[in-house]
C-alpha cells in the first residue's frame, strides 16, 4: 500500500558554475595571438513543476537530498563551458513551498506551474572576457560561483471542493466511499483513518471532489489525538461538512456538543493560518451538518428530534443519512454541488502564469552596496558585507597573485578602501569578506581616484618589431647546445647589440 506523505523537508544544492579558462591563442605565423580562454557554464537550477501524474510527496520522503549538475569549465579557443542540466522535480497540485522560517514562497496550484527552488551559480569569466585596454593578457580567470544551497519545506494541501470533519468513527470514510470511488480503510474503532482520502463525486454530468481527514477530538489544537496536522487539506475547500455520529454511546457526547467542540478546534486552527485562499477564513466557509448512522432506529429518532434545534442554533442545512444503508445521499449530493458551483463562480480567477521565479531577499546586501562594521572577534578588525564584494571573493583564485590583485582593484574601485579609512582602519588591519580574512594594504593614497592597474599586461604586445628567422634559428641552436649563448660570431659587439635589442 502506498504511503501518503504530505510534508517533507528538502535539502537542495543547485549546480556550481564552471570555472573560466586561462589560455593564450596559438597559431602558426600568429605569435602572441592574445587571450582566448572561454567562460564557465552556468550551474543547473532545481525547479519544482506541478504535474497531474503525482499525488503525494512520497518520493521526496525517501530522497530528500537533491543536487543539480555543475556547469562545465571553459576552454581555450573561446570555447565556453556547457550549462549544467536543470533538475526538474515533479510535485502534485496544491503544493506549498515554505522556507526554513515557515514563510510561504510559492503556492503551486495549477498543472504546469514552475518554481525555481534553487538557482545555479554563474560561470566564471575566462581571461578573454577579462581583457581590456589596461589588461591585455590576463594570466588568470574567475572561478564559477557556487549554486544556492538551502532547505525548503514542501506541504501538500489537497485541492478538494468539500471537506469532511468529525469525531473519530463518525462515518466520514464510509460516506466518502459510498459517494465516490474512493476506497478508504473503514473500521469501527477510533482513528481508523490515519491519512487523508480524496474522492470524486459524480452528480449527473457534474463532478466535485471530497476530502476526508482523520478524526478530530477536543484538544486537537494542543496535539491530542492526531492533532491538526491534516487540517491543511481542508483549507481550500468550498464547504465543510460536519459528519456527526448519532449512534454514539460515549458518555457526555451528543450531536450539538460534538459540533461545538469541532468548531472550537477549527477556530484554534484558523488562528494559526496566514494564507489567503480567496474563500475567506474557515469560520466564513459554508457548513452542512450530516447526522449519520440513521440505519440504527434509536439514532434516527435522535436525529429527527435534534434536526430543527441544530438548524435554529447554527443556521446550517441538516441532512439525516445512513452511509451504510446508502440512505438520504442524493439530496446531500445536490446540495453540496449547489454550494460548490456557487463558490467556483466567486473564486478569484487564477493568473495566467506558468513560471514563478523566486525573488531574492531585499536587505542591505543589495547590488553595489556594502557595509563595514567592526569585527567583534578581532581587535581592530573589520567585516565587510555586500552582494558584490562577497560574490567577488567567491570568484577569486587566491593561489594566483594576479587574480588577487584584480580583486584588490575591484574592491578599491567600489569604494571599500575609502570606507575602511573612514571606519578608522590602519594598514595591516584584519579584514574579513565572505569568510576570507586578509591584512589590509591600501592600493591608493587617501583622496586619489582608484584606477585599475596594469596587472595582466604583456609588454610584448606593445612591440611592433618581430625577430627575424636568423634570430629564431640562433635561439634554437642555443637551446640545443650547438653554439655558446655568448658566441655572436664575427663582429661580436655589433651582433651583441642586435641580439640584446
Curated annotation (Swiss-Prot):
GO terms for cellular component: cytoplasm. Monomer. An essential GTPase which binds GTP, GDP and possibly (p)ppGpp with moderate affinity, with high nucleotide exchange rates and a fairly low GTP hydrolysis rate. Plays a role in control of the cell cycle, stress response, ribosome biogenesis and in those bacteria that undergo differentiation, in morphogenesis control. GTP binds at residues 166-173, 191-195, 212-215, 292-295, 322-324. Residues 362-442 form the OCT domain. Residues 2-159 form the Obg domain. This is GTPase Obg. Residues 160-341 form the OBG-type G domain. Mg(2+) binds at residues 173, 193. Pfam families: DUF1967, GTP1_OBG, MMR_HSR1. Its cofactor is Mg(2+).
